[in-house]
């Protein structure tokens, strides 16, 4: 994979893997909860793999962003960096919500088993499983949208900077300074040194 922030798809792959991790959990639950002895540990396997792989992909995305586009080298608006980092935060919020819903589901099913209700374990777990998957899809789309928007606008501003075009005339430091020559002459007259006669006095 090429180390270039503009040319890879780590953000898309990270969110895709995370969504698949939660979605495949529906099939895992169907197999593990319909058995005579429910196996809860399998419910954490695919989400765990999705979280780990997604986090690694996002780590490289942030790392390459910091290496390729430091502020000292390129002058783009920092708001796009904030948008990009917000996309990263949404991804980890996605992870947190998914794990919390999964833990709540396992706790609910455990209480059913303690009450000797084994027949509808999978059916009762479906609302939690679909809620986790749906939430993951929505937050992943938000994360991808924010990250790719930042990618796009930072690239545009960097290309403008390379061509010598100001990215935003109202926010750059190279503004024209207006000097009033008449005012300067007036100040010079007021600050002129005293004459020789005044000095002798």
From Swiss-Prot:
<protein>
    <recommendedName>
        <fullName>Uncharacterized protein MG028</fullName>
    </recommendedName>
</protein>
<feature type="transmembrane region" description="Helical">
    <location>
        <begin position="86"/>
        <end position="106"/>
    </location>
</feature>
<keyword id="KW-1133">Transmembrane helix</keyword>
<feature type="compositionally biased region" description="Basic and acidic residues">
    <location>
        <begin position="182"/>
        <end position="191"/>
    </location>
</feature>
<feature type="region of interest" description="Disordered">
    <location>
        <begin position="165"/>
        <end position="201"/>
    </location>
</feature>
<feature type="compositionally biased region" description="Polar residues">
    <location>
        <begin position="192"/>
        <end position="201"/>
    </location>
</feature>
<feature type="transmembrane region" description="Helical">
    <location>
        <begin position="42"/>
        <end position="62"/>
    </location>
</feature>
<keyword id="KW-0812">Transmembrane</keyword>
<feature type="transmembrane region" description="Helical">
    <location>
        <begin position="126"/>
        <end position="146"/>
    </location>
</feature>
<keyword id="KW-0472">Membrane</keyword>
<dbReference type="InterPro" id="IPR035217">
    <property type="entry name" value="DUF5453"/>
</dbReference>
<feature type="transmembrane region" description="Helical">
    <location>
        <begin position="9"/>
        <end position="29"/>
    </location>
</feature>
<dbReference type="GO" id="GO:0005886">
    <property type="term" value="C:plasma membrane"/>
</dbReference>
<dbReference type="Pfam" id="PF17534">
    <property type="entry name" value="DUF5453"/>
</dbReference>
<keyword id="KW-1003">Cell membrane</keyword>
<feature type="compositionally biased region" description="Basic and acidic residues">
    <location>
        <begin position="165"/>
        <end position="174"/>
    </location>
</feature>
């Amino acid at each position: 994979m090429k180390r270039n922030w503009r040319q890879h798809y780590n953000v898309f792959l990270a969110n895709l893997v995370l969504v698949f991790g939660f979605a495949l959990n529906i099939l895992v639950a169907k197999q593990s909860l319909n058995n005579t002895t429910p196996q809860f540990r399998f419910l954490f396997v695919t989400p765990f793999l999705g979280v780990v792989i997604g986090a690694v992909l996002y780590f490289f995305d942030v790392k390459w962003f910091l290496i390729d586009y430091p502020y000292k080298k390129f002058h783009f608006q920092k708001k796009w960096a904030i948008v990009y980092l917000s996309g990263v935060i949404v991804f980890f919020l996605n992870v947190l919500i998914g794990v919390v819903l999964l833990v709540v589901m396992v706790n609910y099913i455990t209480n059913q088993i303690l009450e000797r209700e084994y027949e509808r374990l999978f059916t009762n777990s479906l609302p939690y499983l679909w809620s986790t998957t749906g939430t993951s899809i929505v937050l992943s789309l938000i994360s991808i949208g924010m990250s790719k928007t930042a990618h796009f606008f930072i690239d545009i501003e960097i290309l403008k900077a390379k061509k010598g075009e100001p990215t935003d005339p109202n926010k750059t430091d190279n503004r024209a300074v207006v000097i009033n020559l008449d005012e300067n002459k007036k100040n010079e007259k007021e600050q002129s040194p005293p004459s020789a006669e005044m000095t002798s006095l």
